[in-house]
Design a protein with these regions (language model features):
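Short beta->alpha linker loops
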Residues: 6, 26-27, 185
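ATP-dependent adenylate-handling ligase core
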Residues: 1-9, 37-49, 174-181
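Short, basic, helix/turn surface patches
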Residues: 1-9, 51-58, 233-237
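Short acidic/histidine-rich active-site segments
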Residues: 19-35
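Conserved phosphoryl-transfer catalytic core
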Residues: 40-72
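Short aromatic-enriched loop/helix-cap "lid" or pocket-rim segments at secondary-structure transitions
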Residues: 33-38, 217
Length: 244
């Protein structure tokens, strides 16, 4: 269900015209601190000094502030535990919205059934290391690597991921926070290690992903009507409420 598989498919298909094996950078962001969200603990650090009951009070206060008001999001996120805050980055629906769409869901089905055991292994680590840990064992393992492997193999292309070599993995696990994010720069240690090898314009270029403009496509009547007809004409009644 990752939209990035669309451009990845075409990149893999084109690459296969020229080579049989490719090297890819999967894992570098999770291991070396490449995601922008890993900078968040710095901005929220002052909240860590506030007693728990008062922090929860700030969260309740933020709920009554008008939507869009400056500082509302900061107060809310600062009042939350890392586990709840970081999971929220991946949430597309509130439980109420999800239940309206899929009435068979229940509050007992919680993301913590999956994440609690992973977070438990990172108790006592710094916040960024904990965020990286959850990403490695959910997002990286369950999405990124699966997607890359299946799409490249669908094009008879072999994918190698050198950043996930055991020696590299073990070295990255020993890095302190200030060698992951330094001077506002992500993946600082990795960039330093490669600066005599990789050209400057590549080393510090703007981060590029594989974005797919699905929202833009579906905003147009042709694609919207097509997608809606697929849903309404499908046998999906057992999965979700089509009227929602």
């Amino acid at each position: 269900a990752d939209p990035a598989l669309v451009p990845l498919y075409f990149v893999a298909r084109e690459a296969r015209k020229h080579v049989k094996v490719v090297l890819s950078g999967e894992g570098a962001d999770e291991l070396f601190g490449g995601y922008t969200i890993y900078k968040e603990p710095l901005s929220l650090a002052p909240f860590e000094k506030i007693p728990g009951p008062l922090r929860r009070g700030l969260g309740a206060f933020s709920d009554i502030l008008p939507e869009g008001m400056r500082g509302k999001s900061l107060l809310k996120r600062g009042s939350m535990t890392l586990e709840d805050r970081y999971y929220g980055n991946a949430r597309s629906f509130t439980f109420e919205q999800m239940h309206n769409l899929m009435p068979w869901t229940t509050p007992e089905w919680d993301h913590q059934d999956v994440t609690d055991s992973i977070y438990a292994k990172s108790q006592g680590w710094d916040p960024v290391a904990r965020m990286q840990h959850i990403d490695m064992f959910t997002w990286l393992r369950g999405d990124i690597l699966v997607k890359a492997d299946r799409i490249t193999m669908a094009n008879s292309l072999e994918l190698r991921v050198p950043f996930l070599d055991k020696v590299v993995w073990d070295a990255a696990q020993k890095l302190p926070y200030d060698m992951k994010i330094a001077h506002g720069t992500s993946k600082w240690a990795l960039r330093e290690a490669l600066k005599t090898i990789v050209p400057e314009h590549v080393l510090h270029r703007r981060k590029l992903g594989f974005p797919v403009p699905i929202r833009h496509w579906l905003a147009g009547p042709e694609m919207y009507d097509w997608a809606r007809s697929l849903i309404l004409e499908s046998e999906a009644d057992a999965l979700f409420d089509k009227s929602a």
